[in-house]
């Protein structure tokens, strides 16, 4: 059903418009997603040193997750740490990467220890880095209000991310704890609160929103 929706309805209508928009994002180095990813790989490798081997792979593009894992396999590593670059956990994003990794390594004769970093939405280093970017933009102009906009998810997926009966799509997201640590909505609000604090924003100076081209999808 998802395949038919994306390939039969969404892609044919969206592709021409998307291609025009993405072309505007291209630089002399090519795709920002690719070269920023490779830059991150190199910087992380330099920071970790020769005791680690950092590989970079993407879920739907090249280099692929499969090629990254094969690169690590050739190094005969004892342990693999998988870090999907999604700050907030969602089954459709982070979970999809985890599923892909396990689907690939299940065919290996020797499977090393594998650890997943499922979320880093409240990591101090992440918050500080993003806040620094925000400060640079805010210093260029006076903003009356800041909007934190996140990719939207169907409510049915959000409800599955918390302990049964805990998520009410409301006040339950005012705190971030072990009962809702995998709730995408609660994670986004947690990130926003921490960023707002780092940026010196009062509660009435920012808004958290969710956007999707599919409009309402329960």
Residue ranges of predicted features:
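Active-site-proximal alpha-helix that buttresses catalytic centers in soluble enzyme cores
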Residues: 1-218
């Amino acid at each position: 059903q998802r395949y038919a929706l994306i390939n039969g309805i969404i892609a044919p209508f969206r592709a021409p418009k998307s291609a025009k928009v993405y072309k505007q994002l291209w630089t002399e180095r090519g795709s920002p997603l690719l070269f920023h990813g490779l830059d991150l790989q190199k910087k992380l490798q330099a920071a970790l040193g020769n005791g680690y081997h950092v590989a970079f792979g993407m879920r739907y593009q090249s280099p692929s997750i499969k090629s990254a894992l094969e690169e690590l396999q050739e190094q005969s590593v004892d342990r693999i740490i998988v870090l999907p670059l999604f700050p907030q956990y969602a089954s459709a994003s982070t979970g999809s990467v985890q599923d892909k990794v396990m689907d690939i390594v299940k065919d290996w004769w020797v499977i090393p220890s594998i650890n997943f970093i499922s979320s880093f939405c409240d990591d101090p280093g992440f918050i500080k880095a993003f806040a620094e970017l925000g400060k640079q933009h805010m210093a260029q102009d006076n903003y009356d209000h800041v909007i934190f906009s996140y990719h939207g998810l169907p409510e049915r997926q959000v409800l599955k991310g918390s302990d049964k009966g805990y998520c009410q799509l409301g006040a339950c997201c005012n705190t971030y704890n072990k009962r809702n640590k995998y709730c995408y909505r609660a994670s986004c609000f947690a990130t926003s609160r921490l960023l707002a604090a780092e940026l010196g924003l009062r509660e009435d100076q920012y808004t958290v929103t969710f956007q999707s081209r599919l409009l309402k999808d329960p």
